[in-house]
A protein has these predicted regions:
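Outer-membrane beta-barrel pore proteins
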Residues: 1, 28, 78-80
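Transmembrane beta-barrel architecture of outer-membrane proteins
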Residues: 2-6, 14-20, 40-44, 65, ...
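C-terminal structured domain segments across diverse proteins
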Residues: 5-14, 26-31, 47
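Phosphate-binding glycine-rich loops and their immediate beta-loop-alpha structural context
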Residues: 23
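Acidic, glycine-rich low-complexity/disordered segments
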Residues: 29-55
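C-terminal outer-membrane beta-barrel translocator/porin domains of Gram-negative envelope proteins
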Residues: 46-191, 196, 204-206, 211
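Short basic (Lys/Arg) and small-residue
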Residues: 199
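C-terminal beta-signal and terminal closure region of outer-membrane beta-barrel proteins
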Residues: 207-228
């Protein structure tokens, strides 16, 4: 696998990753699937000339090897156009060989409910963390950003701590999201729902300079289209 993440304009760095991953999933108990994987990555990080001195220290080449575990408990009534039930997913990447020894955690929970006829309402939460087991600074590319779909109305990647003019992400993010469909307004349009939404999110933690941490809750409320 190969991937390029270009955040030079917004976050002051660019990452080129090459590597491979191998994994498998199996049903451990009813509705509970366990995934086990391993990935080995070679990464090159370059930083912008205007980046801070602490960011420039992270420029260079890296090799990382991780073992991943994924636990997925799925009680939805159906995978597509779900109307009831919930799913809960926890994943962790444990460093085996890594210069920064970064441990990644992610937990997602989402519940679906039909409050009235032809309505689908959801509530979800997300928590992610990226920290070093040995107290090192995690790489610029390992820092977390709030997904755009989790905080609508804000520019993607431009929320949270800043180092000079660069949005540098955080060691932790959390989000809460609620949506409810508005039936009958678009009932003649296929694969599109009109939804009301409320989002709240926080991003915090700057391990390489705690004076840059400005964690605060951002929120938005609105109406949008959901493409199925």
């Amino acid at each position: 696998e190969s991937a390029v993440t270009d955040r030079l304009s917004s976050s002051g760095y660019k990452s080129n990753v090459t590597g491979f991953s191998v994994g498998t999933k199996f049903e451990y108990l009813d509705d509970l699937k366990l995934g086990v994987s391993t990935k080995n990555l070679i990464e090159k990080i370059t930083v912008d000339s205007t980046a801070s001195s602490k960011q420039k220290k992270q420029e260079g080449n890296y090799f990382d090897s991780f073992i991943g575990l994924d636990f997925n408990y799925d009680k939805r009534n159906q995978k597509f156009q779900t109307t009831s039930g919930f799913f809960s997913n926890y994943s962790i990447d444990v460093p085996v060989l890594s210069e920064t020894n970064t441990l990644n955690n992610s937990y997602i929970y989402k519940i679906y409910k039909e409050l009235y006829e032809n309505n689908i309402s959801t509530f979800s939460l997300l928590f992610q963390s990226t920290t070093s087991l040995t107290g090192d600074d995690v790489k610029l590319s390992e820092r977390l950003y709030i997904p755009g779909r989790k905080l609508r109305g804000f520019e993607r990647g431009k929320v949270g701590p800043k180092d000079q003019s660069d949005f540098i992400g955080g060691n932790y993010i959390s989000t809460l999201n609620a949506t409810t469909t508005v039936p009958k307004l678009l009932e003649n349009v296929q694969n599109v729902d009109l939804v009301m939404f409320a989002d709240a999110a926080n991003i915090w933690g700057v391990d390489y300079d705690d004076t840059l941490d400005n964690g605060e809750i951002r929120s938005s409320i609105g109406v949008g289209l959901d493409w199925l």
